[in-house]
C-alpha cells in the first residue's frame, strides 16, 4: 500500500480486467544441415530470405559423384541438400528461418586458401612464413572455393620530378645518386608508400618502387626521396613523374544460383591492406609474410599492360568441410549449454522455433534425435524426409519404425530446377517446401487450418514429383500416416495429406496437434506473471479470466468447434481443481478443455435416384 504523508492530489494507476495472453508465432522454423560456409559455433542464425541465406551461409552445394552419393545414401545422409530446402521454404511462403550449420566432429575440415610465393601458388606448411600473402577463407567449407581475391594498384596522386643541380660554387661533387628523386610538391607523398616512375619520353617499362628516407636534408627546390628497390637504379630526367599508388583488394563470392557479393578494401601498402581485410571482411583473412619477402614480392618489373590491372588474381581452392566424414552424431549434436550446443540440440537455444527439419536426412538416429527434441521441449513440430528412391512398399517399411504425434512424413521427393543451371532437375527433399507451406498456411488462414490441398511452389511444373501417386496408391499410404504429394490436372501439384505419425487417433491430424502446441505455448508464456503471486481466490479468478479471454479469441478465429464459447472450451481454476495439499505444496492447478475443429478429410456426397413424384410429395 502506498503511504500518504503530505496533503495533495495523488494519481494512481489501477489494473482492470485480466492480463491478456498473446498468441505465440507458429510460422518460425529451424533447420539443421551442412552449408558452404557460415558460423560453426554459437546459436542458430536467423535468415529472412534466400539472399540473406547466401550472404551468411554461402551458395548451393555441389553434389558428390555417384560413388559419393551412394556412400551418403548408405548412411541416410544427403548432406548437400540443405540450401535447396531453404529455397523451398522461402518459395512456399516461409519468412523466418533459423539455421544451424553442421560440421564433422573429426578435424578434417579446412578453409580454402591461396598463397603468393616466389615460385608457386600453394598453401605453406603450418607455421611457415615463406610466403608474401596468404589468403584464407574465414570459415572451413567448400564455400571458400567460390571466393575470388583480386589486388590491383590504383593511382592516388601524381608528382612532377625535378633534378637538383649542384651549386656552381661547390667543389667537384660526386655524380648524383640516380636513385635520388626530388618532387616539387610533396603533397601527401611520404616515405613508405609505393610509387611508379613514369617516363616523360614514354620509353621504358614502368616499375614499382618504395619511397625510402635515408635522413638526407631536403634538396634545393623540392623534397628528396630514395627509390628502392633500385636494381638497376632508375635514371631520373626532367619531366618524369612519380605516380603514387594505393593497393585495392576486391573479394568476390560467386557461387551457383546465388547473386555475387563483393567486398572492396584500399590501403597505401600491402601490410595495411591485409589489416583492412582482416578487420572488415566477412569472407577471407589475409596474412602477410616476412617483411623482406613482402618487399620483394611487389612486382618490381610489372609489365606495362598490367600496371593498373589486378596483379594478384586468385581463386581460393581446396576448401572442404569434410562432409564425407559426417555422422549421425554430428547432426544430433551435443548439449554444451546455451550458445555451445551443436546440431539439433542447438535449436533449443531458439524458443521461437515452432517447426523444424533436417532436410535430406533419413538416418534413423538423426530422426529419433529430432523427434526426441520436439517431444522434450513440447513446443514444436517436425517434418521428416523418407528415402529418396523408396517405392510404396519401401516408404511404408520406413514409416513402420516411427510413431509420434510430433512429426509428419511426406512422399515422394521433389524435382526442382538445378541451381547450377544443368538441364536435368535436381532431387530435393520435401521437408523444406512443406515447412514453407506450413508457414504460409499459418499466416493466411491460421494454425488450425490443415496445411493441405495447397499448391507446391518452386518445383518443376508438371513433373515436380519424383513419383506419380494415384488415389489407389494413396489408399495404401494415408492409413499409415504417410502424406502424399500428388499432381492433379488443371490443379497443379498439391499437398494431399495432413496426418501425423501418431497411432493415437486423437492426434492423427497435423493441424490439431499444432493447434494444441500453439494454445499450450501461448498460455505458458502468458501466465509467467502468476509465479509467486499469492495463491488464493483472487489469483485463480484472474487466471480463469485471462485464459477465457484468450480462448474466446481463438474460438472467434474458427479454430474451435461449437456455436458458443461454452461449447468450444471450458476453464476451471478453483477449489475443485486443487486440494489443500496442492496449496501447501505451492501448486496452482488450472484445467482447460478445448474442442478443436478437425479437417474435412473425407468429403462424402450421397446421391440417390428419385422420381419427380417422390421429390414433390
Regions of interest found by a model, annotated:
Residues 1-113, 120, 130-140, 203-204, ...:
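Structured, hydrophobic secondary-structure cores that serve as assembly/anchoring elements
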Residues 114-136, 142-229:
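Autoprocessing Asn-cyclization modules and mimics
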Residues 128-131, 189-191, 238-248, 588:
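A short, compositionally biased
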Residues 201-293:
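Small/polar beta-strand repeat architecture
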Amino acid at each position: 500500500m502506498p503511504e500518504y504523508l503530505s496533503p495533495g492530489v495523488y494519481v494512481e494507476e489501477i489494473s482492470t480486467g485480466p492480463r491478456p495472453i498473446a498468441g505465440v508465432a507458429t510460422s518460425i522454423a529451424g533447420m539443421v544441415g551442412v552449408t558452404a560456409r557460415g558460423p560453426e559455433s554459437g546459436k542458430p542464425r536467423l535468415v529472412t530470405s534466400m539472399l540473406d541465406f547466401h550472404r551468411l551461409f554461402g551458395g548451393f552445394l555441389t553434389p558428390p559423384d555417384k560413388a559419393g552419393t551412394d556412400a551418403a545414401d548408405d548412411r541416410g545422409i544427403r548432406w548437400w541438400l540443405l540450401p535447396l530446402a531453404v529455397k523451398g521454404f522461402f518459395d512456399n511462403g516461409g519468412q523466418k528461418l533459423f539455421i544451424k550449420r553442421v560440421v564433422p566432429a573429426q578435424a578434417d575440415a579446412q578453409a580454402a586458401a591461396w598463397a603468393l610465393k616466389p615460385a608457386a601458388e600453394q598453401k605453406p606448411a603450418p607455421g611457415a612464413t615463406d610466403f608474401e600473402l596468404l589468403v584464407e577463407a574465414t570459415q572451413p567449407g567448400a564455400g571458400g572455393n567460390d571466393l575470388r581475391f583480386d589486388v590491383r594498384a590504383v593511382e592516388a596522386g601524381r608528382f612532377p620530378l625535378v633534378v637538383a643541380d649542384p651549386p656552381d660554387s661547390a667543389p667537384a661533387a660526386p655524380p648524383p645518386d640516380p636513385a635520388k628523386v626530388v618532387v616539387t610538391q610533396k603533397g601527401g607523398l611520404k616515405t613508405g608508400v609505393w610509387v611508379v616512375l613514369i617516363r616523360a619520353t614514354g620509353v621504358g617499362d614502368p616499375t614499382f618502387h618504395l619511397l625510402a628516407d635515408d635522413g638526407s636534408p631536403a634538396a634545393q627546390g623540392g623534397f628528396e626521396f630514395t627509390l628502392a628497390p633500385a636494381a638497376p637504379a632508375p635514371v631520373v630526367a626532367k619531366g618524369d613523374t612519380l605516380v603514387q599508388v594505393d593497393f585495392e583488394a576486391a573479394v568476390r563470392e560467386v557461387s551457383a544460383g546465388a547473386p555475387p557479393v563483393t567486398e572492396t578494401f584500399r590501403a597505401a601498402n600491402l601490410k595495411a591492406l591485409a589489416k583492412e581485410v582482416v578487420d572488415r571482411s566477412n569472407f577471407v583473412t589475409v596474412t602477410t609474410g616476412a617483411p623482406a619477402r613482402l618487399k620483394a614480392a611487389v612486382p618490381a618489373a610489372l609489365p606495362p599492360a598490367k600496371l593498373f590491372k589486378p596483379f594478384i588474381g586468385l581463386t581460393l581452392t581446396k576448401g572442404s568441410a569434410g562432409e564425407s566424414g559426417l555422422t549421425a552424431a554430428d547432426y544430433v549434436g551435443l548439449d554444451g549449454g546455451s550458445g555451445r550446443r551443436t546440431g539439433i540440440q542447438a535449436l533449443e537455444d531458439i524458443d521461437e522455433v515452432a517447426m523444424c527439419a533436417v532436410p535430406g536426412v533419413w538416418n534413423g538416429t538423426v530422426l529419433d534425435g529430432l523427434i526426441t527434441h520436439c517431444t522434450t521441449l513440447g513446443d514444436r513440430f517436425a517434418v521428416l524426409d523418407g528415402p529418396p528412391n523408396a517405392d510404396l512398399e519401401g516408404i511404408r517399411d520406413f514409416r513402420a519404425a516411427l510413431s509420434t504425434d510430433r512429426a509428419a512424413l511426406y512422399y515422394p521427393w521433389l524435382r526442382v530446377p538445378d541451381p547450377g543451371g544443368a538441364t536435368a532437375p535436381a532431387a530435393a527433399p520435401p521437408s523444406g517446401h512443406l515447412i514453407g507451406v506450413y508457414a504460409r498456411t499459418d499466416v493466411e488462414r491460421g494454425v488450425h487450418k490443415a496445411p493441405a490441398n495447397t499448391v507446391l511452389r518452386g518445383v518443376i511444373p508438371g513433373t515436380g514429383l519424383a513419383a506419380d501417386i494415384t488415389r489407389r496408391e494413396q489408399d495404401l499410404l494415408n492409413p499409415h500416416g504417410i502424406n502424399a504429394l500428388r499432381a492433379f490436372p488443371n490443379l497443379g501439384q498439391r499437398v494431399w495429406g495432413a496426418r501425423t505419425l501418431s497411432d493415437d487417433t486423437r492426434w492423427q491430424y497435423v493441424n490439431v496437434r499444432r493447434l494444441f502446441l500453439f494454445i499450450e505455448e501461448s498460455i505458458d508464456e502468458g501466465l509467467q506473471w502468476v509465479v509467486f503471486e499469492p495463491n488464493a481466490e483472487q489469483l485463480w479468478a484472474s487466471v480463469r479470466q485471462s485464459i477465457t479471454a484468450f480462448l474466446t479469441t481463438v474460438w472467434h478465429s474458427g479454430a474451435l468447434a461449437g456455436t458458443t464459447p461454452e461449447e468450444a472450451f471450458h476453464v476451471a481454476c478453483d477449489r475443485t481443481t486443487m486440494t489443500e495439499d496442492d496449496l501447501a505444496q505451492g501448486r496452482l492447478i488450472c484445467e482447460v478443455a478445448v474442442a478443436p475443429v478437425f479437417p474435412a478429410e473425407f468429403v462424402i456426397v450421397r446421391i440417390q435416384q428419385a422420381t419427380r413424384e417422390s421429390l414433390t410429395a
